[in-house]
Protein backbone atom coordinates (compact mmCIF):
# COMPACT_ATOMS: atom_id res chain seq x y z
CA UNK A 1 0.00 0.00 0.00
CA UNK A 2 1.31 3.47 -1.01
CA UNK A 3 2.20 5.83 1.80
CA UNK A 4 0.30 9.08 1.54
CA UNK A 5 2.46 12.04 2.58
CA UNK A 6 0.21 14.98 3.42
CA UNK A 7 3.06 17.53 3.42
CA UNK A 8 4.03 16.57 -0.17
CA UNK A 9 0.44 16.82 -1.37
CA UNK A 10 -0.06 20.18 0.31
CA UNK A 11 3.17 21.58 -1.24
CA UNK A 12 2.07 20.41 -4.74
CA UNK A 13 -1.33 22.05 -4.24
CA UNK A 14 0.36 25.23 -2.96
CA UNK A 15 2.65 25.34 -6.04
CA UNK A 16 -0.32 24.91 -8.38
CA UNK A 17 -2.24 27.68 -6.62
CA UNK A 18 0.79 30.00 -6.94
CA UNK A 19 1.14 29.20 -10.66
CA UNK A 20 -2.56 29.76 -11.32
CA UNK A 21 -3.01 33.04 -13.17
CA UNK A 22 -6.29 33.91 -14.81
CA UNK A 23 -6.37 37.03 -16.99
CA UNK A 24 -9.84 38.48 -16.80
CA UNK A 25 -10.62 40.64 -19.82
CA UNK A 26 -13.65 42.85 -19.39
CA UNK A 27 -15.19 43.68 -22.76
CA UNK A 28 -17.97 46.13 -23.50
CA UNK A 29 -20.31 44.11 -25.74
CA UNK A 30 -23.55 45.10 -27.46
CA UNK A 31 -26.03 43.57 -29.91
CA UNK A 32 -27.09 44.92 -33.31
CA UNK A 33 -30.81 45.75 -33.34
CA UNK A 34 -30.99 47.03 -36.92
CA UNK A 35 -28.58 48.05 -39.67
CA UNK A 36 -28.96 49.88 -42.97
CA UNK A 37 -27.96 53.03 -44.91
CA UNK A 38 -24.59 53.11 -43.16
CA UNK A 39 -26.22 53.33 -39.70
CA UNK A 40 -26.49 50.62 -37.01
CA UNK A 41 -28.65 50.70 -33.87
CA UNK A 42 -26.95 48.78 -31.07
CA UNK A 43 -28.41 47.60 -27.74
CA UNK A 44 -26.11 47.32 -24.73
CA UNK A 45 -22.68 49.03 -24.74
CA UNK A 46 -23.44 50.72 -21.41
CA UNK A 47 -19.84 51.97 -21.00
CA UNK A 48 -19.45 53.47 -24.50
CA UNK A 49 -18.03 57.01 -24.97
CA UNK A 50 -19.29 59.57 -27.49
CA UNK A 51 -17.14 59.21 -30.62
CA UNK A 52 -15.69 55.83 -29.52
CA UNK A 53 -14.65 53.35 -32.20
CA UNK A 54 -16.65 50.11 -32.18
CA UNK A 55 -15.75 46.82 -33.88
CA UNK A 56 -18.42 44.63 -35.47
CA UNK A 57 -18.14 40.85 -35.99
CA UNK A 58 -17.12 41.30 -39.66
CA UNK A 59 -14.29 43.68 -38.57
CA UNK A 60 -16.17 46.77 -39.85
CA UNK A 61 -15.37 49.82 -37.71
CA UNK A 62 -18.11 52.19 -36.56
CA UNK A 63 -18.27 55.41 -34.54
CA UNK A 64 -20.76 55.87 -31.68
CA UNK A 65 -22.46 59.20 -32.37
CA UNK A 66 -25.90 58.98 -30.71
CA UNK A 67 -25.98 57.82 -27.08
CA UNK A 68 -29.66 57.28 -26.32
CA UNK A 69 -31.37 55.84 -23.23
CA UNK A 70 -32.00 52.38 -24.70
CA UNK A 71 -29.62 52.13 -27.69
CA UNK A 72 -26.55 53.59 -29.37
CA UNK A 73 -26.63 55.09 -32.90
CA UNK A 74 -23.47 54.02 -34.76
CA UNK A 75 -22.23 55.29 -38.15
CA UNK A 76 -20.27 52.73 -40.16
CA UNK A 77 -16.90 53.32 -41.84
CA UNK A 78 -17.54 50.62 -44.41
CA UNK A 79 -20.47 49.21 -46.36
CA UNK A 80 -21.36 46.84 -43.48
CA UNK A 81 -22.96 44.27 -45.80
CA UNK A 82 -21.98 41.37 -43.53
CA UNK A 83 -23.39 42.89 -40.35
CA UNK A 84 -26.46 40.93 -39.25
CA UNK A 85 -29.23 41.71 -36.81
CA UNK A 86 -28.31 40.11 -33.49
CA UNK A 87 -24.55 40.06 -34.18
CA UNK A 88 -22.25 41.37 -31.46
CA UNK A 89 -20.43 44.70 -31.31
CA UNK A 90 -17.36 45.33 -29.18
CA UNK A 91 -16.21 48.68 -27.75
CA UNK A 92 -12.51 49.36 -28.41
CA UNK A 93 -12.11 52.07 -25.75
CA UNK A 94 -10.38 54.29 -28.37
CA UNK A 95 -11.35 57.55 -30.05
CA UNK A 96 -10.63 57.80 -33.81
CA UNK A 97 -6.90 58.37 -34.42
CA UNK A 98 -4.55 58.04 -37.37
CA UNK A 99 -0.85 57.30 -37.86
CA UNK A 100 1.27 60.36 -38.77
CA UNK A 101 4.85 60.86 -39.94
CA UNK A 102 7.18 62.37 -42.53
CA UNK A 103 6.75 59.27 -44.73
CA UNK A 104 3.21 60.41 -45.61
CA UNK A 105 4.61 63.18 -47.87
CA UNK A 106 3.97 62.39 -51.53
CA UNK A 107 1.32 59.79 -50.66
CA UNK A 108 -2.39 59.40 -51.41
CA UNK A 109 -4.34 58.13 -48.39
CA UNK A 110 -7.96 57.54 -47.36
CA UNK A 111 -9.60 59.31 -44.36
CA UNK A 112 -8.18 56.67 -41.99
CA UNK A 113 -4.65 57.43 -43.35
CA UNK A 114 -4.47 54.05 -45.12
CA UNK A 115 -2.49 54.30 -48.38
CA UNK A 116 -4.46 53.87 -51.62
CA UNK A 117 -1.62 54.52 -54.10
CA UNK A 118 -0.13 50.97 -54.13
CA UNK A 119 3.22 52.17 -52.72
CA UNK A 120 3.10 50.17 -49.50
CA UNK A 121 2.49 51.19 -45.91
CA UNK A 122 4.18 54.51 -44.93
CA UNK A 123 6.31 54.42 -41.77
CA UNK A 124 4.59 56.32 -38.96
CA UNK A 125 6.16 58.30 -36.10
CA UNK A 126 3.16 57.87 -33.82
CA UNK A 127 -0.54 58.66 -33.89
CA UNK A 128 -2.72 61.76 -33.59
CA UNK A 129 -6.38 62.09 -32.68
CA UNK A 130 -8.46 62.96 -35.74
CA UNK A 131 -10.36 65.52 -33.65
CA UNK A 132 -7.79 67.28 -31.49
CA UNK A 133 -8.14 70.59 -29.69
CA UNK A 134 -7.37 73.81 -31.55
CA UNK A 135 -4.49 75.92 -30.15
CA UNK A 136 -5.59 78.36 -27.42
CA UNK A 137 -5.43 82.15 -27.56
CA UNK A 138 -2.10 82.34 -25.70
CA UNK A 139 -0.50 79.76 -27.99
CA UNK A 140 -1.14 81.87 -31.09
CA UNK A 141 0.35 84.99 -32.60
CA UNK A 142 -1.16 87.29 -35.20
CA UNK A 143 -0.59 86.50 -38.88
CA UNK A 144 2.55 88.28 -40.06
CA UNK A 145 4.13 86.26 -42.90
CA UNK A 146 2.76 86.06 -46.44
CA UNK A 147 1.60 82.77 -47.97
CA UNK A 148 2.28 83.57 -51.63
CA UNK A 149 -0.25 81.95 -53.99
CA UNK A 150 1.59 82.95 -57.17
CA UNK A 151 -1.69 84.46 -58.45
CA UNK A 152 -1.18 88.20 -58.99
CA UNK A 153 -4.80 89.21 -58.29
CA UNK A 154 -4.77 87.42 -54.91
CA UNK A 155 -1.27 88.35 -53.71
CA UNK A 156 -1.84 92.03 -54.53
CA UNK A 157 -5.45 92.67 -53.45
CA UNK A 158 -6.58 89.73 -51.26
CA UNK A 159 -3.30 88.70 -49.58
CA UNK A 160 -3.20 85.45 -47.60
CA UNK A 161 -0.90 85.07 -44.58
CA UNK A 162 0.53 81.96 -42.93
CA UNK A 163 -1.98 80.84 -40.32
CA UNK A 164 -4.95 82.50 -42.02
CA UNK A 165 -8.22 80.85 -43.12
CA UNK A 166 -9.30 82.16 -46.52
CA UNK A 167 -12.46 80.81 -48.12
CA UNK A 168 -12.55 80.11 -51.87
CA UNK A 169 -16.20 80.32 -52.92
CA UNK A 170 -17.98 80.14 -56.25
CA UNK A 171 -20.27 78.14 -58.51
CA UNK A 172 -19.21 74.85 -60.06
CA UNK A 173 -16.67 75.12 -62.89
CA UNK A 174 -15.35 78.58 -61.96
CA UNK A 175 -11.76 77.53 -61.19
CA UNK A 176 -11.87 77.06 -57.39
CA UNK A 177 -9.67 73.94 -57.38
CA UNK A 178 -7.33 75.61 -59.91
CA UNK A 179 -6.66 78.50 -57.47
CA UNK A 180 -5.93 76.00 -54.67
CA UNK A 181 -3.61 73.86 -56.83
CA UNK A 182 -1.73 76.92 -58.11
CA UNK A 183 -1.10 77.84 -54.46
CA UNK A 184 0.32 74.35 -53.78
CA UNK A 185 2.54 74.51 -56.89
CA UNK A 186 3.82 77.95 -55.81
CA UNK A 187 5.08 76.55 -52.46
CA UNK A 188 7.90 74.68 -54.25
CA UNK A 189 11.18 75.48 -52.50
CA UNK A 190 9.39 77.43 -49.71
CA UNK A 191 9.60 74.59 -47.12
CA UNK A 192 5.80 74.43 -46.79
CA UNK A 193 4.00 71.10 -46.29
CA UNK A 194 0.72 70.96 -48.23
CA UNK A 195 -2.30 68.74 -47.57
CA UNK A 196 -5.04 68.47 -50.21
CA UNK A 197 -8.30 66.96 -48.94
CA UNK A 198 -10.73 65.82 -51.66
CA UNK A 199 -14.25 65.24 -50.29
CA UNK A 200 -16.94 63.53 -52.36
CA UNK A 201 -15.13 64.03 -55.67
CA UNK A 202 -14.91 61.75 -58.69
CA UNK A 203 -11.91 59.42 -58.57
CA UNK A 204 -10.95 60.71 -62.05
CA UNK A 205 -10.78 64.31 -60.74
CA UNK A 206 -8.49 63.25 -57.87
CA UNK A 207 -6.28 61.30 -60.31
CA UNK A 208 -6.01 64.46 -62.42
CA UNK A 209 -4.94 66.49 -59.37
CA UNK A 210 -2.29 63.88 -58.48
CA UNK A 211 -0.87 63.84 -62.02
CA UNK A 212 -0.77 67.66 -62.33
CA UNK A 213 1.03 67.97 -58.97
CA UNK A 214 3.43 65.22 -59.99
CA UNK A 215 4.12 66.95 -63.30
CA UNK A 216 5.06 70.19 -61.51
CA UNK A 217 7.19 68.40 -58.88
CA UNK A 218 4.78 69.46 -56.13
CA UNK A 219 3.74 65.99 -54.93
CA UNK A 220 7.00 65.57 -52.94
CA UNK A 221 5.82 68.04 -50.28
CA UNK A 222 2.07 67.26 -50.53
CA UNK A 223 -0.21 64.69 -48.86
CA UNK A 224 -3.51 63.90 -50.59
CA UNK A 225 -6.43 62.68 -48.45
CA UNK A 226 -9.39 61.49 -50.49
CA UNK A 227 -12.91 60.30 -49.70
CA UNK A 228 -14.38 59.70 -53.16
CA UNK A 229 -18.02 60.18 -54.13
CA UNK A 230 -18.69 56.46 -53.60
CA UNK A 231 -17.16 56.43 -50.08
CA UNK A 232 -19.49 56.04 -47.07
CA UNK A 233 -20.82 59.34 -45.67
CA UNK A 234 -18.83 58.72 -42.46
CA UNK A 235 -15.51 58.79 -44.34
CA UNK A 236 -16.52 61.95 -46.24
CA UNK A 237 -17.39 63.52 -42.88
CA UNK A 238 -14.04 62.72 -41.19
CA UNK A 239 -11.76 63.37 -44.21
CA UNK A 240 -11.14 67.10 -43.41
CA UNK A 241 -10.30 66.30 -39.77
CA UNK A 242 -7.77 63.70 -40.98
CA UNK A 243 -6.18 66.31 -43.25
CA UNK A 244 -5.97 68.76 -40.33
CA UNK A 245 -4.42 66.08 -38.06
CA UNK A 246 -1.71 65.30 -40.66
CA UNK A 247 -0.95 69.03 -41.02
CA UNK A 248 -0.89 69.51 -37.22
CA UNK A 249 1.89 66.93 -36.93
CA UNK A 250 4.12 69.17 -39.08
CA UNK A 251 2.79 72.44 -37.57
CA UNK A 252 3.82 71.41 -34.04
CA UNK A 253 7.29 70.59 -35.42
CA UNK A 254 7.62 74.29 -36.34
CA UNK A 255 6.82 73.95 -40.05
CA UNK A 256 4.52 76.06 -42.19
CA UNK A 257 1.62 74.00 -43.58
CA UNK A 258 -1.17 74.63 -46.06
CA UNK A 259 -4.43 72.63 -46.03
CA UNK A 260 -7.03 72.72 -48.80
CA UNK A 261 -10.51 71.32 -48.10
CA UNK A 262 -12.16 70.63 -51.46
CA UNK A 263 -14.98 71.05 -50.68
CA UNK A 264 -16.78 71.58 -47.37
CA UNK A 265 -20.22 71.72 -49.02
CA UNK A 266 -19.99 67.99 -49.69
CA UNK A 267 -18.79 67.34 -46.13
CA UNK A 268 -21.83 69.22 -44.78
CA UNK A 269 -24.10 67.16 -47.05
CA UNK A 270 -22.53 63.91 -45.81
CA UNK A 271 -23.02 65.08 -42.22
CA UNK A 272 -26.64 66.02 -42.98
CA UNK A 273 -27.22 62.53 -44.41
CA UNK A 274 -25.76 60.88 -41.28
CA UNK A 275 -27.72 63.15 -38.93
CA UNK A 276 -31.06 62.57 -40.65
CA UNK A 277 -30.51 58.80 -40.65
CA UNK A 278 -29.68 59.01 -36.93
CA UNK A 279 -33.04 60.85 -36.54
CA UNK A 280 -31.51 64.06 -35.22
CA UNK A 281 -33.92 67.00 -35.63
CA UNK A 282 -33.36 68.91 -38.90
CA UNK A 283 -32.97 72.70 -38.99
CA UNK A 284 -32.52 75.22 -41.82
CA UNK A 285 -32.12 73.51 -45.25
CA UNK A 286 -32.52 70.20 -43.31
CA UNK A 287 -29.00 70.55 -41.84
CA UNK A 288 -28.67 69.56 -38.16
CA UNK A 289 -28.33 72.28 -35.53
CA UNK A 290 -24.59 71.71 -34.99
CA UNK A 291 -23.49 72.12 -38.62
CA UNK A 292 -21.84 75.46 -37.72
CA UNK A 293 -19.77 73.67 -35.07
CA UNK A 294 -18.87 71.02 -37.68
CA UNK A 295 -16.91 73.64 -39.65
CA UNK A 296 -15.82 75.98 -36.83
CA UNK A 297 -14.01 73.24 -34.90
CA UNK A 298 -12.20 72.25 -38.10
CA UNK A 299 -11.16 75.75 -39.20
CA UNK A 300 -10.17 76.90 -35.70
CA UNK A 301 -7.32 74.37 -35.89
CA UNK A 302 -5.62 76.66 -38.44
CA UNK A 303 -3.25 78.97 -36.56
CA UNK A 304 0.08 80.76 -36.47
CA UNK A 305 1.73 79.40 -33.32
CA UNK A 306 3.90 81.59 -31.12
CA UNK A 307 7.65 81.01 -30.81
CA UNK A 308 7.27 79.03 -27.54
CA UNK A 309 5.35 76.38 -29.48
CA UNK A 310 7.83 76.40 -32.37
CA UNK A 311 6.32 79.14 -34.56
CA UNK A 312 4.71 76.68 -36.99
CA UNK A 313 1.55 77.55 -38.89
CA UNK A 314 -1.43 75.97 -40.58
CA UNK A 315 -3.08 77.96 -43.35
CA UNK A 316 -6.53 76.71 -44.36
CA UNK A 317 -8.13 77.27 -47.77
CA UNK A 318 -11.64 75.81 -47.48
CA UNK A 319 -13.64 75.63 -50.72
CA UNK A 320 -17.42 76.10 -50.84
CA UNK A 321 -19.58 75.53 -53.92
CA UNK A 322 -22.54 77.91 -54.34
CA UNK A 323 -25.70 77.41 -56.38
CA UNK A 324 -26.22 80.16 -58.99
CA UNK A 325 -23.94 82.56 -57.09
CA UNK A 326 -26.07 82.51 -53.92
CA UNK A 327 -23.61 83.37 -51.14
CA UNK A 328 -26.46 83.92 -48.67
CA UNK A 329 -27.33 80.21 -48.39
CA UNK A 330 -26.80 78.47 -45.03
CA UNK A 331 -23.39 76.79 -45.46
CA UNK A 332 -21.73 79.70 -47.38
CA UNK A 333 -22.78 82.27 -44.73
CA UNK A 334 -21.61 79.97 -41.93
CA UNK A 335 -18.15 79.47 -43.44
CA UNK A 336 -17.81 83.16 -44.44
CA UNK A 337 -18.39 84.10 -40.79
CA UNK A 338 -15.79 81.57 -39.54
CA UNK A 339 -13.00 82.42 -42.00
CA UNK A 340 -10.70 85.48 -42.21
CA UNK A 341 -11.92 86.53 -45.65
CA UNK A 342 -13.12 85.05 -48.92
CA UNK A 343 -12.12 84.89 -52.57
CA UNK A 344 -15.30 84.94 -54.66
CA UNK A 345 -15.07 83.39 -58.12
CA UNK A 346 -17.73 84.52 -60.57
CA UNK A 347 -19.17 82.37 -63.35
CA UNK A 348 -19.89 85.45 -65.51
CA UNK A 349 -16.26 86.63 -65.31
CA UNK A 350 -15.04 83.09 -66.04
CA UNK A 351 -17.24 82.82 -69.13
CA UNK A 352 -16.14 86.25 -70.38
CA UNK A 353 -12.52 85.06 -70.42
CA UNK A 354 -11.27 86.73 -67.22
CA UNK A 355 -9.36 83.94 -65.47
CA UNK A 356 -8.77 83.57 -62.57
CA UNK A 357 -12.40 84.79 -62.35
CA UNK A 358 -11.98 86.69 -59.08
CA UNK A 359 -14.74 89.18 -58.27
CA UNK A 360 -12.59 91.81 -56.55
CA UNK A 361 -15.61 93.77 -55.31
CA UNK A 362 -16.84 91.19 -52.78
CA UNK A 363 -13.57 89.34 -52.19
CA UNK A 364 -11.71 90.41 -49.06
CA UNK A 365 -8.84 89.39 -46.81
CA UNK A 366 -9.37 90.39 -43.18
CA UNK A 367 -5.63 90.11 -42.50
CA UNK A 368 -4.85 92.65 -45.22
CA UNK A 369 -1.41 94.15 -45.75
CA UNK A 370 0.03 92.37 -42.67
CA UNK A 371 0.33 89.41 -45.04
CA UNK A 372 2.24 91.30 -47.77
CA UNK A 373 5.87 92.17 -48.31
CA UNK A 374 6.65 95.91 -48.30
CA UNK A 375 7.33 96.00 -52.06
CA UNK A 376 3.82 94.71 -52.79
CA UNK A 377 2.25 97.21 -50.35
CA UNK A 378 4.12 100.02 -52.13
CA UNK A 379 2.78 99.19 -55.60
CA UNK A 380 -0.62 97.55 -54.98
CA UNK A 381 -2.13 100.03 -52.52
CA UNK A 382 -4.31 101.77 -55.12
CA UNK A 383 -5.02 98.72 -57.31
CA UNK A 384 -8.28 97.60 -55.71
CA UNK A 385 -9.72 101.13 -55.72
CA UNK A 386 -8.72 101.68 -59.37
CA UNK A 387 -10.41 98.44 -60.42
CA UNK A 388 -13.56 99.21 -58.41
CA UNK A 389 -13.83 102.67 -60.03
CA UNK A 390 -13.20 101.11 -63.44
CA UNK A 391 -15.99 98.54 -62.96
CA UNK A 392 -18.41 101.34 -62.00
CA UNK A 393 -17.39 103.51 -64.95
CA UNK A 394 -17.57 100.59 -67.37
CA UNK A 395 -21.17 99.87 -66.38
CA UNK A 396 -22.03 103.58 -66.71
CA UNK A 397 -20.21 104.03 -70.05
CA UNK A 398 -22.43 101.45 -71.75
CA UNK A 399 -25.29 104.00 -71.58
CA UNK A 400 -23.29 107.19 -72.23
CA UNK A 401 -22.09 108.02 -75.73
CA UNK A 402 -19.78 111.03 -75.23
CA UNK A 403 -17.29 110.61 -72.39
CA UNK A 404 -14.78 113.26 -71.33
CA UNK A 405 -11.05 112.65 -71.74
CA UNK A 406 -10.40 111.85 -68.05
CA UNK A 407 -13.11 109.17 -68.05
CA UNK A 408 -11.77 107.67 -71.29
CA UNK A 409 -8.26 107.55 -69.78
CA UNK A 410 -9.57 105.87 -66.64
CA UNK A 411 -11.43 103.27 -68.71
CA UNK A 412 -8.32 102.61 -70.81
CA UNK A 413 -6.18 102.22 -67.66
CA UNK A 414 -8.77 99.87 -66.12
CA UNK A 415 -8.84 97.61 -69.19
CA UNK A 416 -5.07 97.25 -69.04
CA UNK A 417 -5.08 96.59 -65.29
CA UNK A 418 -7.67 93.86 -65.80
CA UNK A 419 -5.49 92.40 -68.52
CA UNK A 420 -2.36 92.18 -66.32
CA UNK A 421 -4.31 90.24 -63.68
CA UNK A 422 -5.22 87.47 -66.13
CA UNK A 423 -3.11 84.37 -65.65
CA UNK A 424 -2.88 80.86 -67.09
CA UNK A 425 -3.56 77.85 -64.88
CA UNK A 426 -0.59 76.06 -63.24
CA UNK A 427 1.77 78.97 -63.94
CA UNK A 428 2.29 80.88 -60.68
CA UNK A 429 4.30 84.12 -60.85
CA UNK A 430 7.02 84.91 -58.26
CA UNK A 431 6.27 87.91 -56.03
CA UNK A 432 9.12 90.07 -57.42
CA UNK A 433 7.69 89.70 -60.95
CA UNK A 434 4.16 90.42 -59.67
CA UNK A 435 5.50 93.65 -58.13
CA UNK A 436 7.00 94.66 -61.49
CA UNK A 437 3.79 93.85 -63.40
CA UNK A 438 1.56 95.88 -61.06
CA UNK A 439 4.02 98.79 -60.93
CA UNK A 440 3.92 98.91 -64.75
CA UNK A 441 0.12 98.95 -64.90
CA UNK A 442 -0.67 101.26 -61.98
CA UNK A 443 1.84 103.94 -63.05
CA UNK A 444 0.44 104.22 -66.57
CA UNK A 445 3.33 102.64 -68.49
CA UNK A 446 0.84 100.45 -70.39
CA UNK A 447 -1.53 103.28 -71.38
CA UNK A 448 0.02 103.67 -74.84
CA UNK A 449 0.15 99.92 -75.57
CA UNK A 450 -2.79 98.24 -77.32
CA UNK A 451 -4.91 96.16 -74.91
CA UNK A 452 -4.44 92.95 -76.93
CA UNK A 453 -0.64 93.43 -76.80
CA UNK A 454 -0.50 93.76 -72.97
CA UNK A 455 -0.08 89.99 -72.25
CA UNK A 456 2.86 89.79 -74.71
CA UNK A 457 4.41 92.92 -73.16
CA UNK A 458 4.19 91.38 -69.67
CA UNK A 459 5.85 88.14 -70.87
CA UNK A 460 8.70 90.12 -72.47
CA UNK A 461 9.11 92.32 -69.36
CA UNK A 462 9.35 89.24 -67.10
CA UNK A 463 11.94 87.70 -69.44
CA UNK A 464 13.98 90.92 -69.53
CA UNK A 465 14.00 91.25 -65.72
CA UNK A 466 14.96 87.58 -65.30
CA UNK A 467 17.71 87.46 -67.94
CA UNK A 468 19.11 91.01 -68.28
CA UNK A 469 18.43 92.45 -64.82
CA UNK A 470 18.48 89.56 -62.30
CA UNK A 471 19.62 91.97 -59.57
CA UNK A 472 16.04 93.43 -59.51
CA UNK A 473 14.59 90.10 -58.34
CA UNK A 474 17.48 89.48 -55.93
CA UNK A 475 17.03 92.93 -54.35
CA UNK A 476 13.28 92.44 -53.73
CA UNK A 477 13.75 88.87 -52.46
CA UNK A 478 16.40 89.97 -49.96
CA UNK A 479 15.19 93.43 -48.82
CA UNK A 480 11.43 92.78 -49.43
CA UNK A 481 11.00 96.39 -50.55
CA UNK A 482 11.16 98.42 -53.77
CA UNK A 483 14.04 100.83 -53.20
CA UNK A 484 15.16 103.63 -55.55
CA UNK A 485 17.82 101.49 -57.28
CA UNK A 486 15.32 98.68 -57.97
CA UNK A 487 12.76 101.18 -59.24
CA UNK A 488 15.31 102.66 -61.68
CA UNK A 489 16.17 99.15 -62.91
CA UNK A 490 12.47 98.43 -63.44
CA UNK A 491 11.91 101.70 -65.32
CA UNK A 492 14.89 100.87 -67.56
CA UNK A 493 13.46 97.39 -68.25
CA UNK A 494 10.04 98.87 -69.11
CA UNK A 495 11.66 101.36 -71.54
CA UNK A 496 13.76 98.63 -73.19
CA UNK A 497 10.79 96.32 -73.73
CA UNK A 498 8.43 99.12 -74.72
CA UNK A 499 10.40 100.03 -77.84
CA UNK A 500 8.95 97.08 -79.73
CA UNK A 501 5.39 97.61 -78.46
CA UNK A 502 4.35 101.27 -78.68
CA UNK A 503 1.02 101.73 -80.46
CA UNK A 504 1.26 102.76 -84.07
Swiss-Prot record:
It catalyses: ATP + H2O + 4 H(+)(in) = ADP + phosphate + 5 H(+)(out). It is an enzyme of class 7 (translocase). SUPFAM superfamilies: C-terminal domain of alpha and beta subunits of F1 ATP synthase (SSF47917), N-terminal domain of alpha and beta subunits of F1 ATP synthase (SSF50615), P-loop containing nucleoside triphosphate hydrolases (SSF52540). Disulfide bonds: none annotated. The record marks 363 as: Required for activity. It is found in: Plastid, Chloroplast thylakoid membrane. GO terms for cellular component: chloroplast thylakoid membrane; proton-transporting ATP synthase complex. InterPro entries: ATP_synth_asu-like_sf, ATP_synth_asu_C, ATP_synth_asu_C_sf, ATP_synth_F1_a_nt-bd_dom, ATP_synth_F1_asu, ATPase_a/bsu_AS, ATPase_F1/V1/A1_a/bsu_N, ATPase_F1/V1/A1_a/bsu_N_sf. Keywords: ATP synthesis, ATP-binding, CF(1), Chloroplast, Hydrogen ion transport, Ion transport, Membrane, Nucleotide-binding, Plastid, Thylakoid, Translocase, Transport. ATP binds at residues 170-177. It holds the Pfam family ATP-synt_ab_N. Its EC number is 7.1.2.2. It is a peripheral membrane protein. Signal peptide: none annotated. GO terms for molecular function: ADP binding; ATP binding; proton-transporting ATP synthase activity, rotational mechanism. Belongs to the ATPase alpha/beta chains family. F-type ATPases have 2 components, CF(1) - the catalytic core - and CF(0) - the membrane proton channel. CF(1) has five subunits: alpha(3), beta(3), gamma(1), delta(1), epsilon(1). CF(0) has four main subunits: a, b, b' and c. Produces ATP from ADP in the presence of a proton gradient across the membrane. The alpha chain is a regulatory subunit. This is ATP synthase subunit alpha, chloroplastic. The lineage of its organism: Eukaryota, Rhodophyta, Bangiophyceae, Bangiales, Bangiaceae.
Amino acid sequence: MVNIRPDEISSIIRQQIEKYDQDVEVANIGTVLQVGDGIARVYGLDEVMAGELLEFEDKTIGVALNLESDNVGVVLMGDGRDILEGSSVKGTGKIAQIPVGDAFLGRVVDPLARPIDNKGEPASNGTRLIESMAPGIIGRQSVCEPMQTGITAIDSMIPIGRGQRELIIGDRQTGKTAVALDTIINQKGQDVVCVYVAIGQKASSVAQVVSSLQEKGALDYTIIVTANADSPATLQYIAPYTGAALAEYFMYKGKATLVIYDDLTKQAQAYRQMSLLLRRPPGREAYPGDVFYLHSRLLERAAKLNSDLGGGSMTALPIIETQAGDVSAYIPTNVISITDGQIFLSGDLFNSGIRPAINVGISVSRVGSAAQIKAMKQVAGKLKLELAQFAELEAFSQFASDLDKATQNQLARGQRLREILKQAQNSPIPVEEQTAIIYTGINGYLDDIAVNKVPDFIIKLREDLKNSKPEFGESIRSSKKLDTASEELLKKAIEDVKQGFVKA
